[in-house]
């Protein structure tokens, strides 16, 4: 969008430092937070359509957004204490969707209202790792601890769970739109433990 990318130091000497990187000029500009800011060591960073950066961490109480032009960061409190976030994605409306690994749920931050909406997993200890919205009605996630692919209808709040045929240890998930009559999305995941690729394709809503 603007010739920059975002890089975050998760561990080591620069743990918690995010950089806005200008490839053409080879300039790395650190994001400086004021004293007293909430913890901000991101496990995952994502950019919206204007290249503003979102940050999440599975052990933190906030999600945060850094303005691409001013580098000012705003923190937003997650309603469920300790829910955190592991991986996520930004949709076409610049909403952040993320998996609440510790909180066993899905979170969504709307930048227009600056409000966070949460949905709790129907099965305890699912430990969702990643979440992605399909731009229609469903958000997909996967259980790191129980090998469930999970589809949430965000309009009705209804969950559908699909037990995978073998141990997968789900991490990153990918959503694909379909040309079927119901415009249903499908779910792709790579097996962390088995080297296999699994595709879950619902045929009905």
Specify the residue positions occupied by each region the protein language model found:
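Beta-propeller fold detector
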Residues: 29-34, 74-78, 117-121, 160-164
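Short loop/turn segments that connect beta-strands within beta-propeller blades
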Residues: 22-26, 67-71, 110-114, 153-157, ...
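C-terminal closing repeat unit and adjoining cap/tail of repeat-based domains
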Residues: 145-193, 200-205
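Conserved beta-strand positions in repeat-built beta-propeller and related beta-rich domains
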Residues: 7-13, 53-59, 96-102, 139-145, ...
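A short loop-to-beta-strand structural motif that recurs across blades of beta-propeller domains
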Residues: 16-19, 62-65, 105-108, 147-150, ...
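Solenoidal tandem-repeat scaffolds enriched in leucines and small polar residues
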Residues: 12, 18-23, 28-32, 37-68, ...
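A generic "binding-loop/recognition-motif" signal
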Residues: 24, 59, 69, 102-103, ...
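Beta-rich, blade/repeat-based domains predominating
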Residues: 1-3, 36-51, 80-95, 99, ...
């Amino acid at each position: 969008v603007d010739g920059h990318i975002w890089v975050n130091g998760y561990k080591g000497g620069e743990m918690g430092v995010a950089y806005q990187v200008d490839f053409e000029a080879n300039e790395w500009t650190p994001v400086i937070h004021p004293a007293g800011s909430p913890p901000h060591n991101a496990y995952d960073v994502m950019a919206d359509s204007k290249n503003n950066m979102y940050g999440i961490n599975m052990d933190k109480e906030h999600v945060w957004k850094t303005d691409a032009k001013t580098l000012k960061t705003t923190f937003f409190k997650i309603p469920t204490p300790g829910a955190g976030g592991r991986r996520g994605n930004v949709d076409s409306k610049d909403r952040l969707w993320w998996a609440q690994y510790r909180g066993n749920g899905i979170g969504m931050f709307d930048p227009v209202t600056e409000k966070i909406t949460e949905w709790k997993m129907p099965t305890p200890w699912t430990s969702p790792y990643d979440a992605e919205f399909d731009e229609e009605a469903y958000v997909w996630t996967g259980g790191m601890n129980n090998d469930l692919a999970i589809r949430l209808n965000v309009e009705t709040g209804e969950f559908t769970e699909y037990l995978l045929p073998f141990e997968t240890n789900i991490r990153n998930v990918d959503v694909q739109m379909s040309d079927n009559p119901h415009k249903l999305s499908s779910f792709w995941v790579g097996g962390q433990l088995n080297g296999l690729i699994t595709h879950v394709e619902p045929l009905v809503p």
